[in-house]
């Protein structure tokens, strides 16, 4: 996989800094290096395949994610990317709901209830919302600065919107 932009560099730096929101800033043509060796999802993990395909292993179960499909990774799950096609392009969003817990309230309780009803580590599906998830990744990257209070609050609202979108899928 070749990388055509600095989205992977930004994502890897966000992950190294343990930021609440780590996103690829749109499509990227590579995966973070840590994804190839049992990476732990702290809270919410989303990988949208926009072209090609890749294989992901979660707790010794392998899944194939094709173009226009999304892998949803559960909290505290370990996963590894086991292979990918040369034309693979993905959008990655990892975030902690703690940063918006005060806004979400009962929605978080509902999400935990759903996790108890369906405790799978990974779901792979075509949601029909892949282009919207890609757009969220791009929007979350805009104005990514702690110095700008407006941008920080806008990111929290985008994260809230993304969370509600995910609950509707």
PLM ranges: what are they?
Residues 71-74, 92-94:
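Short hydrophobic-aromatic micro-motifs
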Residues 129, 147-155:
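Residue-level recognition of alpha-helical structural elements
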Residues 60-61, 85, 150-151:
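Short, solvent-exposed loop/turn segments at secondary-structure boundaries
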């Amino acid at each position: 996989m070749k990388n055509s932009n600095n989205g992977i560099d930004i994502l890897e730096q966000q992950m190294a800094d343990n930021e609440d929101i780590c996103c690829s800033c749109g499509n990227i043509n590579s995966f973070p290096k840590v994804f190839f060796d049992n990476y732990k999802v702290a809270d919410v993990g989303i990988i949208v395949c926009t072209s090609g395909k890749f294989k992901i292993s979660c707790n010794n179960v392998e899944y194939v994610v094709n173009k226009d499909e999304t892998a949803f990774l559960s909290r505290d799950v370990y996963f590894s990317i086991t292979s990918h096609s040369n034309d693979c392009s993905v959008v990655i969003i990892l975030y902690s709901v703690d940063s918006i817990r005060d806004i979400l309230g009962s929605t978080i309780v509902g999400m935990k209830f759903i996790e108890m009803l369906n405790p799978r580590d990974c779901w792979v599906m075509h949601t029909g919302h892949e282009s919207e998830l890609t757009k969220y990744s791009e929007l979350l990257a805009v104005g990514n600065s702690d110095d700008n209070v407006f941008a920080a609050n806008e990111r929290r609202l985008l994260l809230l919107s993304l969370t509600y979108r995910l609950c509707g899928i």
